[in-house]
């Protein structure tokens, strides 16, 4: 039962997570009428007054491609957006930008916020350009504003800016020292206020290509507080919840139009505390329930045993999802599985490696979204991790100048990403066709 499942998470999987330091590892827009913004009504997303269900992707590096700096590639950006749209993918989860210094191992570059309140204008330009190009293709974009993990700065960078000692690097110094360090973000008022200033700057921005305020841009699906926000200790849980609530209220004070989301992994992002998971999603400013699912990272399936443990991974995935659907039902809010992934066969990274188990795992989740649409259910969408498209990474360990492929700099390139010639890419195309053809309750069956 679900109570026993939560107990299992606490007693068995959380210690593994603490030891391993698991992380991850969110045309037609001229009309500014309220209906062109996605909103929530009675537990459903509505777009143009119709229920909105989607199968989307993570594409955190899109704004970097949009820049005119040395790391940008507007030609590739256009091709990737077109390739995604061709596969029915029109919901993108994107990082606003990285924080801090360059030259840090396991961290992405280039850097948007180079010092508190100081920004690389080429990357702001790239963000504006990316948003315009997404809007031209009728895409919706989740913009997450910071990160609890080291790969883009986030918590640890704000702590250093607030005067704390140099942050440990998980891949070098170990995950436990990093976890202990970033647990200092939630109680650090100075670090939190610098982040709040960043929120004010980005949410208050006007796009230089469209001359439209971000707060008035229907292409934004939701503002997201953080990628995988965590308290990082039981002692921080109360203050963590208050921080989520206060940040959501800040965003709402700046933008009355868009949805707001947490970016949470769900239970595993809340110290395996069901009440905390529900509490951070219960704030009236928070529009929907987030969760992330990482069966390999969470050791539901392990290297050398992927085949034997695959059914276990699928079953635990279903149970984890059901726990969050229960929360959503109590809150009467939709659910988005905004990150999920599975390794290539034999946990290899090379392009061309078969994805037999990944495809089977994806099919389970994609079918759940399609089935939910048929029932008018609370599971409204998912974003797979992540789109690599035409990328050809030159190294397993990312180096600046290598193609971005959605696997962040702290992970092997090719680990979870989906290339345009993977069988997974066609699976996604087929799933979106089936989703589009699936009638809502009370509708006649759509033409296939």
Predicted regions and their residues:
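Active-site mouth of glycoside hydrolases
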Residues: 35-301, 309-335, 340-443
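Amphipathic helical hotspot of TIR/SEFIR-family domains
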Residues: 304
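Hydrophobic alpha-helical segments, especially transmembrane helices
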Residues: 11-13, 94
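Short, solvent-exposed mixed-charge patches
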Residues: 446-448
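Sec-dependent N-terminal signal peptides
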Residues: 13-22
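Short, Lys/Arg-enriched N-terminal segments with co-localized hydrophobic residues
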Residues: 1-8
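C-terminal motif of bacterial Sec signal peptides marking the signal peptidase cleavage site
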Residues: 25-26
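Ser/Thr/Pro/Gly-rich low-complexity linker/stalk segments immediately outside membranes or between
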Residues: 30-33
């Amino acid at each position: 039962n679900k109570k026993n499942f939560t107990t299992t998470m606490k007693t068995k999987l959380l210690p593994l997570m603490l030891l391993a330091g698991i992380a991850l590892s969110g045309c037609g827009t001229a009309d500014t009428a309220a209906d062109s913004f996605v909103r929530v009504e009675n537990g459903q997303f509505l777009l143009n007054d119709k229920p909105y269900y989607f199968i989307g992707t993570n594409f955190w590096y899109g704004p970097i491609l949009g820049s005119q700096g040395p790391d940008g590639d507007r030609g590739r950006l256009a091709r990737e957006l077109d390739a995604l749209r061709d596969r029915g993918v029109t919901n993108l989860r994107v990082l606003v930008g990285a924080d801090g210094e360059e030259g840090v191992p396991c961290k992405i570059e280039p850097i948007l916020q180079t010092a508190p309140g100081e920004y690389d204008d080429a990357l702001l330009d790239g963000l504006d350009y990316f948003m315009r190009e997404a809007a031209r293709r009728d895409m919706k974009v989740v913009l997450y504003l910071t990160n609890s993990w080291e790969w883009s700065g986030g918590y640890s960078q704000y702590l250093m800016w607030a005067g704390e000692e140099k942050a440990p690097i998980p891949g070098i110094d170990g995950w436990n020292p990093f976890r202990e360090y970033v647990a200092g973000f939630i109680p650090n008022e100075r670090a939190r206020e610098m982040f709040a200033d960043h929120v004010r700057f980005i949410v208050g921005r006007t796009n230089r290509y469209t001359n439209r305020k971000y707060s008035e841009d229907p292409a934004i699906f939701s503002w997201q507080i953080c990628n995988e926000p965590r308290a990082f200790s039981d002692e921080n849980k109360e203050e963590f919840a208050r921080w989520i609530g206060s940040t959501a209220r800040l965003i709402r004070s700046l933008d009355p139009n868009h949805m707001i989301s947490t970016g949470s992994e769900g239970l595993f992002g809340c110290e395996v505390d069901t009440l905390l998971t529900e509490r951070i999603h219960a704030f009236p400013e928070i529009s929907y329930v987030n969760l992330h699912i990482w069966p390999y990272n969470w050791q539901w399936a392990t290297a050398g045993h992927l085949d034997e443990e695959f059914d276990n991974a699928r079953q635990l995935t279903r149970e984890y999802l059901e726990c969050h659907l229960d929360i959503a039902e109590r809150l009467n809010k939709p659910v988005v599985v905004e990150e999920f992934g599975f390794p290539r066969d034999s946990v290899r990274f090379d392009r061309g490696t078969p994805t037999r188990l990944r495809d089977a795992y994806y099919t389970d989740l994609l079918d759940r979204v399609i089935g939910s649409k048929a029932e008018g259910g609370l599971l409204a969408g998912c974003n797979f991790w992540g789109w690599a498209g035409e990328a050809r990474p030159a190294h397993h360990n990312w180096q600046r100048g290598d193609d971005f492929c959605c696997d962040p700099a702290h992970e092997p390139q090719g680990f979870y990403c989906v290339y345009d010639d993977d069988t997974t890419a066609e699976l996604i195309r087929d799933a979106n066709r089936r989703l589009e053809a699936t009638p809502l309750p009370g509708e006649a069956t759509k033409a296939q």
